[in-house]
């Protein structure tokens, strides 16, 4: 594997490992500092909101100043965020840590996505994005496990560990990452508003809407999953860990071994539509499942559809972006963060109304995504006929 690709994958893995580390440790912080569930919600939302605001600037600056520089700045911010959380003893410090962490993700994500697109041959781009999505998934899987294990020693240890990894990733990036000779900055040599008018914004409307809608539905489901299974079939933390880990492993395997093969036979939009329909069917089965093993088995396969959609959308963004890979990566990260910010807030309120309501929400959002894809496919077909 190309050394640069390996380092980029490591950086992405680090960011999402750091996000996952927080999950088992935050309740301990809440108890120590006397914080409430609302405070926990604010800490989670602060990260997503910060990433959402910073991502478009991170993407544009990556195109202008170089993706390596933006990635390195993001990694330094990541380490600062983790060390702040490790030493924090009041809510204000923890909140500032999460804001800085969101800024870090908002710089690293578009920088890495754009650089992978730049250095990947066209025939390997879909495969490399599939690997990237699998690595993101792996970070989410391993993060809570590592965080929970280290918390047995000290609930602050996971954050020191993540901060140290950030420094290591920064050093590796300085030494091993090089911006490609061919620049993808045309139109962004100066950060002037009128230059944005040169972008064909209509091209990005459908992927932006899809990204927002799908991240909203997916985050709503994933955020409430542990509470849902605990209330429905009395899953213990161990059961939930097995279900999430199993689902994550299956999702990662499909991304690594099957995603690029599917991309040879389907367009991104067609593949996204079929993945959404698969997810709808599995979510409906989850609603009707009431036994321990039936829900466990469904949990192993429920994430496959969502995990296949992520790299498909990333690849779709890349293919329509042309020489604006950093800009497209910034848009992708921005609207993913927006969905990750809004989804859990809505799902939490719905869960208080009815235990199945967040699942219904995810089903409705997935069906809406299918409709959006079909409308876009018809629109493209008409444009193709007009150009013939």
Curated annotation (Swiss-Prot):
Q: Where are the transmembrane segments?
A: 5-25, 42-62, 69-89, 99-119, 129-149, 157-177, 201-221, 239-259, 269-289, 293-313, 331-351, 355-375
CDD domains referenced in this protein's UniProt entry, alphabetically: MFS_MdtG_SLC18_like
Which Gene3D superfamilies is this protein grouped with? MFS general substrate transporter like domains
- UniProt key word Transmembrane: yes
Q: Does this entry carry the keyword Transcription regulation?
A: no
Q: Which GO terms describe its molecular function?
A: xenobiotic transmembrane transporter activity
Arranged from A to Z, the UniProt key words for this protein are: Cell membrane, Membrane, Transmembrane, Transmembrane helix, Transport
NCBIfam families in the cross-refs: 2_A_01_02
Q: In its UniProt entry, what is this protein called? A: Quinolone resistance protein NorA
